[in-house]
């Protein structure tokens, strides 16, 4: 359950 955090962080940073 770490991929979700990674994707979320990546998406948040990209914003």
UniProtKB/Swiss-Prot annotation:
Classification from the root reads: Eukaryota, Viridiplantae, Streptophyta, Embryophyta, Tracheophyta
Q: Which domain of life is it from?
A: Eukaryota
Family statement drawn from the similarity comment of this UniProt entry: Belongs to the leguminous lectin family.
Q: Which GO terms describe its molecular function?
A: carbohydrate binding
Up-regulation conditions = Hemagglutinating activity is inhibited by polygalacturonic acid.
Which key words tag this protein in UniProt? Answer: Hemagglutinin, Lectin
Name this polypeptide is given: Lectin 29 kDa subunit
**Organism name:** Vigna unguiculata subsp. sesquipedalis (Yard-Long bean)
Described purpose of this protein according to its UniProt entry? Trypsin-stable lectin with hemagglutinating activity. Has mitogenic activity on murine splenocytes. Inhibits HIV-reverse transcriptase.
How does the annotation summarize its subunit structure?
Heterodimer of a 29 kDa and a 31 kDa subunit.
């Amino acid at each position: 359950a770490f991929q979700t955090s990674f994707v979320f962080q990546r998406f948040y940073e990209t914003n």
